[in-house]
A protein has these predicted regions:
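Non-catalytic DNA-recognition/assembly elements of restriction-modification systems
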Residues: 1-20, 152-222
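A generic structural signal for short beta-strands and their flanking turns/coil linkers
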Residues: 33, 51, 99-101
Length: 227
């Protein structure tokens, strides 16, 4: 597989920061409308749509640069650094508003958004993404939009990108399936525990204290191990 090295600036058509905090106040939120993203929405490769707050379409229109749509990549620059996710083509909403702690990019024809996200989820990608971070106070990336554009990454042809994405997606689908199985088993185990020890507990069982069944012994400090 042949790679070419590009700066991010050569791989994107657009980059935009989230709105100033004063532009989205608590009283801007409504029960339904255009979703406003937060860190919990960027906890994987693709956008997670588990929980949102909303603003009206008119408010979203007034924050045009902060509007993200399908195919865009969203990155956290303040708070939980290292988060990066793409908005899939089958997302629930046509557009979203990124938060004041995020910025978004729109890829050009040289790179697929999924490939960019997968790259920055690798150890090398995370190192490059966080190389200009500051841990003083709230963790943040210094000059996020400009420093991100100067990052150099290795990119194969679009055809090879699609092949890589296909392999990763297949593996991720298996991981997701296994996670669902594990969740189901945990729920079954909890239900059995509740049925056996709470709902259907035998009234004839003897009650006592844990101290009646165990002996507690404490470890020693390393300096006293020779005693």
């Amino acid at each position: 597989m042949e790679y070419k090295t590009y700066k991010i600036a050569d791989l994107i058509d657009e980059i935009a920061m989230g709105p100033f905090g004063s532009n989205i106040k608590v009283d801007c939120f409504v029960d339904e409308g255009i979703p406003v993203l937060n860190g919990s929405n960027l906890d994987g490769f693709a956008l997670s749509e588990k929980s949102f707050r909303y603003v009206t379409p008119e408010k979203a229109d007034s924050l045009k640069k902060a509007n993200a749509s399908r195919g865009d990549v969203v990155i956290t620059h303040r708070g939980t650094l290292g988060q990066i996710a793409y908005i899939p083509q089958n997302s629930k909403h046509d557009r979203y508003v990124i938060s004041q702690s995020q910025f978004r990019v729109r890829c050009n024809e040289k790179i697929l958004p999924e490939y960019m996200v997968y790259y920055f989820h690798t150890a090398l990608g995370q190192h490059k993404l966080l190389s200009n971070s500051s841990q003083v106070g709230v963790p943040a990336l210094a000059r996020p939009s400009s420093t991100f554009q100067q990052i150099e990454i290795e990119v194969p042809s679009v055809q090879e990108q699609r092949r890589v994405i296909s392999i990763i997606n297949a593996l991720q689908a298996k991981i997701d399936c296994n996670n669902k199985i594990n969740d189901n088993l945990q729920q079954q185990a909890q239900a059995i525990y509740t049925a056996m020890f709470i709902s259907n507990a035998d009234l004839a069982w003897e009650q006592g204290r844990l101290s009646d069944l165990i002996t507690v012994k404490y470890g020693k400090d390393h300096k006293k191990l020779a005693d």
